[in-house]
Amino acid sequence: METSPPSPGPEPYEPITAEKKPGEKCYTMIFFPTALLVLAAGVLIRAYSDPATHASQRLPRAEIPAQAQFIDQKGFNVLPTVPPPSVSNATTFFVPPGYDAEALKEKPFHVYDEEFCDVIGSNPTLTLIANAGPHPLFHEATTWYPPTDEMFFVQNAGAPAAGTGLNKSSIVLKIALSEAAAVSSRRNATGSVNVQTVDSSPMVINPNGGTNYKGQILFAGEGQGADVPPELIVMNPVEPYNTTVLLNNCFGRQFNSLNDVSINPRNKDIYFTDTLYGYLQDFRPAPGLQNQVYRLNDVTGAVTVVADGFSLPNGVTFSPNGSHAYVADTGANRGFWGWNQSYPATLYRYGVQEDGTFENRKVFAFIDSGVPDGVHCDSKGNVYAGCGDGVQVWNPSGKLIGKIYLGEVSANFNFAGKGRMVICAEENLYYVTLAASGGGYIEA
């Protein structure tokens, strides 16, 4: 991960760094270029050469589509050489025996279990629809607005390549999904859709998470400096894009750096995460609260804590019926402070009680590449997360069933109803067609 130098002052966590020592064994690595991201890894690809393993792979019972490939996990349970943590870690891509980096990207739908075939269907597609060069325009808050069939998203707040954070706010953008579909329909499709800037008024400051909310879009704003507090702010998705602040304090205290937000489909309350990335990226002051998950009842105005005990809580979402919550902990990624591999890169699952509180925290999944950032469910309850190598997918029991493999970091993505998905990958924007439907809450 390439980052800016850390700011003066006490370091909240000690990052792990690795250097090659004299006499240390070298391992063959393929370097793969990546965006300069705040929540992303400067990626190394760790590869193992064993063509025979690839040739003898066992296929699942379901037929594999042309754009998919089966990944035999048993084929890499034992490796001839296992590199040390300085070489193989959360900031690297794992290339199974018999593959190389290009082979993994050539057929980007990776089937780890035949259940994934039901997710992708018989003819899935992955299309690059926009590239922003060195600018991380395609970051988070991926939110579909059905009346205009547009997908909204936000620029990376705090990314050095964008110059955003303390002196300049990140911005809201959108695309028309009709344009994305037109590009995707071409043979060997690649192209560019029109990416429009959304000039909200008053401006949403450093937006990060986003979700549908009563026919509008609800953003989690990270704040800016000591004088602009983090906010939950509602934006009209059509011109004049007027905004209204819903919440900007916890009993008179500033939140640390609001990150993501989701609506529980059962009780309709707002749940959001508060974390340290504004501080770790040098555009927010030292934290004044624990890193926690909050609940807002917008009828009574009551704000309550529903979960704590995180390193850095991040994405949050709910199962389609609202009975379970999923919260990402991206503690391994310390922003400008680097990485601590012993910290969480984990999805947790909670039961949501009838009164809206959380119970029975369980580890749902540990991420093999990067950290789990944005999290969403499909209509069948499968769980998706933006990770270091693309979008990873688990069934409701926490079994990894597949990946939409980009070979680069995705911080967030979202469904656009049935059979469509948009994936944000910082400099790149992708359009996906598949069989699954979104399971998120949308109220017109």
Language-model-detected regions and their locations in the chain:
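Conserved beta-propeller blade signature
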Residues: 150-152, 216-220, 269-271, 324-326, ...
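Beta-strand-rich domains and repeat architectures in extracellular enzymes and scaffolds
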Residues: 58-115, 120-170
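Blade-level signature of beta-propeller repeat domains, shared across WD40, Kelch, NHL, RCC1
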Residues: 412-444
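Beta-rich catalytic cores
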Residues: 137-138, 168, 204-206, 228, ...
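Blade-loop segments of beta-propeller domains
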Residues: 133, 157-160, 165-223, 246-250
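Asp-box/WD-like beta-propeller blade repeats and closely related beta-sheet repeat scaffolds
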Residues: 192-208, 220-267, 275-281
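Residue-level detector of Asp-centered blade-edge/turn motifs that repeat once per structural unit
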Residues: 144-148, 212-215, 263-267, 320-321, ...
